A protein has these predicted regions:
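The alpha/beta-hydrolase serine catalytic core
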Residues: 37, 58-178
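Nucleotide-sugar donor-binding loop of glycosyltransferases
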Residues: 10, 42, 131
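Generic hydrophobic alpha-helical segments
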Residues: 21, 25-29, 48, 169-176
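Gly/Ala-rich beta-loop-alpha elbow adjacent to hydrolase catalytic centers
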Residues: 39-48
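Active-site catalytic motif of lipid deacylating hydrolases and related acyltransferases
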Residues: 1-32, 160
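Acidic-histidine catalytic/liganding microenvironments
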Residues: 32, 55, 148
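Active-site signature of alpha/beta-hydrolase-fold catalytic machinery across serine-
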Residues: 50-54, 143
């Protein structure tokens, strides 16, 4: 309806770890680009922010409730004992919001989350984040915004899935393209 050509990535094609998702984004940029705008939500937004730091060309990002600081967020949500058990066993089962089935996540995911949770971005970026997000705290996006002069944030009365705010996408894209 907006007349946009969209390339949708299978983010887990190379694995669940964040570094694998970063690889997926870089492959798309290298093989299918150039793109006018790179857009991702939650872990996809975090993967895009990490992927673009290696590129000097002018890339534009729209990130929807990006999972910045995911190591700290998950650690707080599951607690020290479960975190220790996950590290010891090497795998943990989660039931992601909106999914029909459980997902088993390797501990290497958390190792990546610690290393890649706060990327440096030198590309024009707009973040859309809901004030009611109960998955990724909005404060994570605020901290990220303060770390770069290239980042703006739009805060909305919405949750993590941003279902009530998708009509803003056209404006967000305009913000990074203007």
């Amino acid at each position: 309806e907006l007349g946009w050509e969209v390339t949708s990535l299978e983010m887990r094609r190379n694995g669940w770890e964040l570094s694998s998702q970063v690889k997926t984004v870089r492959e798309a940029i290298d093989n299918d680009g150039p793109f006018d705008v790179l857009m991702g939500s939650s872990f996809g937004g975090l993967a895009i922010a990490n992927a673009v730091k290696e590129y000097s060309e002018d890339l534009r990002l729209v990130l929807l409730a990006p999972a910045f600081g995911v190591y700290d967020t998950l650690s707080e949500q599951i607690g020290d004992s479960e975190l220790g058990e996950w590290k010891k066993v090497g795998i943990k089962t989660f039931h992601p919001l909106g999914w029909d089935e459980d997902v088993s996540i390797p501990w290497t995911f958390m190792e990546d989350a610690r290393r890649l949770g706060w990327p440096e971005v030198n590309h024009r970026t707009v973040i859309l984040h809901g004030l009611l997000d109960d998955v990724v705290p909005i404060e994570s996006s605020r901290v990220f915004m303060r770390s770069s002069p290239f980042v703006e944030i739009v805060e909305v009365d919405d949750g993590h899935r941003l279902g009530e705010s998708l009509e803003l996408l056209r404006d967000l894209v305009s913000m990074v393209l203007d």
